[in-house]
């Protein structure tokens, strides 16, 4: 009798003997070691510290140097966390000072564009699983927050014509357009910003919004397609939209 047949008999519990083996396997599977809180709490923090230190060493001696080597410019105090971004196509990358970029991101340049360029301004943050596809240009201003799983789509991945798609032709160059994100913008998680859009200074894009048109400065947009749902007043010190908010009717449109 082979091992597979033996395992089948145990799972089926065919008779007293195989039922006993099954019960023994269940007991073995549920054996637990006792938890000693002081000891295991210490071991937990030791593991956590060792893991963090290992990630720190990998970041400063491996991940960041590799990523910087393919960028046109990287400013001071740049922080790359959780690995190295996946980069597709030819892409000129310019990064300012005090920028934090999550390594689990995708940065892609359109192959039909002569010089697709990505600019990330001072003090900006790019979160987890963000996708940025660059047509001619994606320009992110200063102190911009781009949350997890945001997509900035600067060009079409495929042509609209089905025959061209079947022939594996790229989308026409003319279908790529810039995306401009001005200073102090917050793009919330899972939002999508499409090609040709400008997000005005101090604006906020709500979670899951799909932005198809320009967003005025100091407004909040939500929905699909995104519409203005609130207007913000800049803070008196000019640091951003920290003042009074005015709701907008459901049918108000961008612009």
What do these predicted ranges mean?
Residues 133-139, 190-202, 209-212:
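Beta-rich strand-turn-strand
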Residues 1-154, 182-183, 201, 217, ...:
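Domain-scale signature associated with acetyltransferase and cell-envelope carbohydrate enzymes
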Residues 91, 116, 136, 175-178, ...:
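Glycine/small-residue-rich pyrophosphate-binding loop that anchors the diphosphate of NDP-sugar donors
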Residues 116, 139, 157-164, 192, ...:
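Conserved SAM-binding loop
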Residues 167-179:
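A short acidic, glycine-rich active-site loop
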């Amino acid at each position: 009798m082979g091992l597979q047949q033996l395992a089948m008999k145990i799972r089926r519990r065919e008779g007293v003997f195989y039922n006993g083996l099954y019960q023994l396997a269940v007991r073995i599977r549920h054996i637990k070691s006792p938890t000693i809180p002081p000891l295991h709490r210490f071991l937990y923090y030791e593991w956590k510290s060792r893991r963090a230190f290992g990630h720190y060493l990998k970041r400063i001696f491996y991940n960041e140097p590799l990523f910087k080597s393919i960028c046109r410019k990287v400013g001071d105090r740049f922080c790359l966390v959780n690995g190295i971004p996946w980069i597709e196509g030819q892409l000129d990358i310019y990064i300012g000072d005090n920028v934090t970029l999550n390594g689990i991101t995708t940065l892609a340049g359109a192959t039909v564009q002569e010089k697709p360029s990505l600019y990330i301004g001072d003090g900006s943050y790019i979160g987890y699983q963000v996708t940025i596809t660059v047509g001619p240009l994606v320009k992110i201003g200063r102190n911009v927050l781009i949350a997890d799983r945001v997509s900035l789509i600067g060009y079409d991945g495929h042509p609209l014509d089905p025959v061209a798609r079947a022939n594996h032709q790229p989308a026409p160059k003319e279908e790529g357009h810039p995306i401009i994100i001005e200073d102090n913008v917050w793009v919330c998680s899972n939002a999508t910003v499409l090609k040709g859009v400008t997000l005005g200074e101090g604006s906020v894009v709500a979670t899951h919004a799909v932005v198809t048109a320009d967003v005025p400065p100091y407004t909040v947009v939500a929905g699909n397609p995104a519409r203005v749902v609130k207007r913000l007043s800049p803070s008196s010190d000019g640091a951003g939209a920290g003042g009074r908010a005015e709701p907008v009717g459901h049918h108000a449109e961008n612009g």
